[in-house]
């Protein structure tokens, strides 16, 4: 997100927040990530004005972050995955006070695929569905939040999702919808995280001035394309 934001004339990241025990705390952001100092420093607290929060953190200390966001009352894009139902409900409840956009996956193409899968299954809900996914070996949650969202559309339990964790970069999700007569196979691949960073920044541009409510990628799809 930091790197991609440099390609947007109308977006500036003003706060670079890490937890108080992070190895990046008080280090130069540019030097830490790109080997070139840019005089922007990782901090544990917010020190500059801002319009919207992007949260790509892991679920560790999620309740502390929710408490902070309750105080700030700023629009927030939540991209954290692997949350419990209780944690997700707490995030949804924030929308009573501020705009909240929940997007475990910020790829617009993934959102369009989910919309397509929903329509296909509504047309013929007797078909069987198989979901599989692969991510780099350092990804913590398994199955991915994106795979879980497809499973929810197909009424599949998460134990029915095939998940692989291998390699250093890249990921894919594959959805197969089939019966005895035909099969539809959909696959989305991403070579790195840039597509999700671009997606997050585009979501923020669309979302940060919206009224308090709960928003999803499907909300964005409906607004832009329907």
State each model region's role.
Residues 60-67, 79-103, 107-120:
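Rossmann-fold NAD(P)-binding glycine/threonine-rich loop
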Residues 70:
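Anion (oxyanion) recognition and catalysis
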Residues 53-54:
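N-terminal Rossmann-like NAD(P) cofactor-binding module of classical short-chain dehydrogenase/reductase
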Residues 1-44, 124-226:
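C-terminal substrate-binding/catalytic lobe of Rossmann-fold NAD(P)-dependent oxidoreductases
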